[in-house]
Amino acid sequence: MDDRYDPQVIEAKWQQEWAARQLDRTDTDPQKPKFYALSMFPYPSGNLHMGHVRNYTITDVIARCRRMQGYRVLHPMGWDAFGLPAENAAIERGIHPRVWTQQNIGQMRQELQRLGLSYDWEREVTTCHPDYYRWTQWLFLEFFEAGLAYQKEAAVNWDPVDQTVLANEQVDSEGRSWRSGALVERRLLKQWFLKITAYAEELLNDLEQLTGWPERVKLMQANWIGQSRGAYLEFPIVGSDEKIGVFTTRPDTVYGVTYVVLAPEHPLTLKVTTSRRRKTVEAFIASVQQESELERTAGDRPKRGVATGGKALNPFTGEEIPIWIANYVLYEYGTGAVMGVPAHDERDFQFAKAHRLPIRQVIIPPDGKASTRLRAAYTEPGKLINSGQFDGMDSTAAKVAITEYATAQGWGREHVQYRLRDWLISRQRYWGVPIPIIHCPQCGPVPVPRSELPVLLPEEVEFTGRGPSPLAKLAAWRDVPCPKCGGPAQRETDTMDTFIDSSWYYFRYADARNSEAPFDPAAIKDWLPVDQYVGGIEHAILHLLYSRFFTKVLRDRQLVHVSEPFQRLLTQGMVQGRTYKNPRTGKYVIPSRIADLNQPTDPDTGEALEVVYEKMSKSKYNGVAPGDVIQQYGADTARMFILFKAPPEKDLEWDDADVEGQFRFLNRVWRLVQTFKAKGGRLGQPLPATLTKAEKDLRRAIHTAIKEISEDIEGDYQLNTAVAELMKLSNALSSADCYTSGVYSEGIQTLLTLLAPFAPHISEELWHQLGGTDSIHRQPWPKADPTALVADEITLVIQVMGKTRGAIQVPATASQAELEEAAQHSEIGQRYLAGKTIKKIIVVPGKLVNFVLESSR
């Protein structure tokens, strides 16, 4: 008997065998129902982390189960391969981004294969490969032709020393460049946008269709889209034909407007500024350009502003009111202007107080009076005062009435506004998809002809981290003839946001080797939508929202038939590791430096350390390398621990002892099968014509496991309880002593079949040791036999005066009278009822009998 379970040998053997047999190749049998299981693809950083392992293992279990249940399953993997880290590597290490990325992909692909993940590698996509980004550019042109891709000026982070644009993550908490240390400036550049706001209403409304998504993700998206209903109102500029448009959710307060505020970047700002105020205004604009958007809008930051000297007319009151600019108003939000109602908005109140602006109360509490001196803004609904013909109206009715009045007068209209802004996709980087546009002085922006796609990234580039992007400096690549007029022109030197690449990759998997189109609509109709998408909650907004937007645009371009890409979404929790932190200094301590981990103290100061679980990271010294776990315990143990430790959607706390526990469990399964073989057991033995009580009990345990695990997988993927059921079944088989019985044979076969999606290698090995043909992963998923689930006997609890006194076994078919009699005449009944008068007997069928006694006097 081979008692030794050697995961390294077994796993390498079967991974090689599965690859040779192409076991994981996508089944395209049209007679089978389809199932598309997808994990969010990774950025190829070079190494897997435990968050990856958890995500991919969960999806792999789902995919393997669905195959065994008779589905044809699409379960692909690829690489979100463009991005800033590769360009940084080029600057720091002198290695080309393409080479660095390819090396990392090779390393990570090997790690994924070691986990036994059942990917169809023939459908692998890599977003930095020309075969992929050719179609990313093709899709950009679809947006351009639909009027959904356009250019406008937008602020970027500018390093004045290196003379280059910085990503947000390259700016530290003090607003300095990561490389030069210079204070970062905000500078306006002409950049490309996608008009996601054109789909804001549909993106919001269609959230209701996503019944398979977590409610919190839908709420996060709804808040990000941020629908507000109110009125658009116009304030004429005194001495000009132009007007300042504002959006407000409180048109009932318009009679209380005592000033208007423009964003410093607003095109009207300098137009309304008087000559006397110009220097002050320009200096203020320059100072605001040094502030990030977060700084400008933070609630705890002072609201700075200056008067322009210009005036606007409040058409409702006929008053001239001052026009200010302020740092808290952003041009990208709404109209880039707000009306100041200090009596009824707390921010306006603080601003008016700071700058001695008039405060006029126009709403009072329903049962109150106007305050002679407001100490704070009154922001609740109430009754209108100082509001002309609308005096006395309640504010809810006044919102409607004032909006209708403004519409009739030509001063405004009812309006719905969204917090969502158009998607800025320009990146002043090399390692991204070149935007397929050529700028011609005569023709303007001209799309690159589709026959000339892809616009390839040039190989011979210099990476310095200084000056314009590498593409902008490469004249041989940049300077080209205009496709329209043939005159001298220049390529667009910005590349696309990497979120573009991940906004359509799930379509490409359905037809990954198509060289004539991004995908065949027939393939999309066959596989989409994704039936189960799995990824982290950190992608709840941007990636998922952009993917939904892309899907709707491609639908409107008649390229796909679906309106939503992902039918069900599972957001797995984080993997957390134990950290040791000095609460006084906030510094983390490396565990290997701590003498006693049970009573940890700082090796430098002797202070007691705080032990908490936090997201794994290098800086906290709490990471666990998947490769180390696989080397010590095997991939199956790593998978089982990841699945067992916590429900998929909850955070998981890494515990070496629990990893060891799963390794012991797989060893028990191994020994169980070796004992079964040694005792003469074999697969496929027929069930006995008549079952003993022990066989009935074992068969009930077998089919209970089938029922419970199937329900766990069909429902909310409670894979942790599914693993617990596997352990129960293993224990039931270990306790039974009928190795040559057909029931035991059924139990071993069921255990291995149910275990296969969770621990694929050991299941395959033991299956073949027992003479199983084909792969265990091609066996049908077992179905629970309802007759086997019915017990011959049940446990009947006996209570006296509501107190449990014990339990007995009775026939499952016993009548109420038989239950009463059995309980009364049992040893327990005789002990507690002797000499007592029974007043009443309460029977809960199948559960308990309660004897109510006459009270003794």
Swiss-Prot record:
Query: In the Enzyme Commission scheme, what number(s) does this protein have?
Result: 6.1.1.4
Motif segment ('HIGH' region)? 42-52
- Provide GO CC annotations from the record: cytosol
Which residues are involved in binding ATP? K618
Q: Where is this motif: 'KMSKS' region?
A: 615-619
- Which reaction is recorded as catalysed by this protein? tRNA(Leu) + L-leucine + ATP = L-leucyl-tRNA(Leu) + AMP + diphosphate
Q: Which GO terms describe its molecular function?
A: aminoacyl-tRNA deacylase activity; ATP binding; leucine-tRNA ligase activity
Q: Which residues pair up as cystines?
A: none
NCBIfam families tied to this protein: leuS_bact (TIGR00396)
Mind telling me which HAMAP family this protein's record contains? Leu_tRNA_synth_B (MF_00049_B)
Name recorded for this polypeptide: Leucine--tRNA ligase
Q: Which organism does this sequence originate in?
A: Thermosynechococcus vestitus (strain NIES-2133 / IAM M-273 / BP-1)
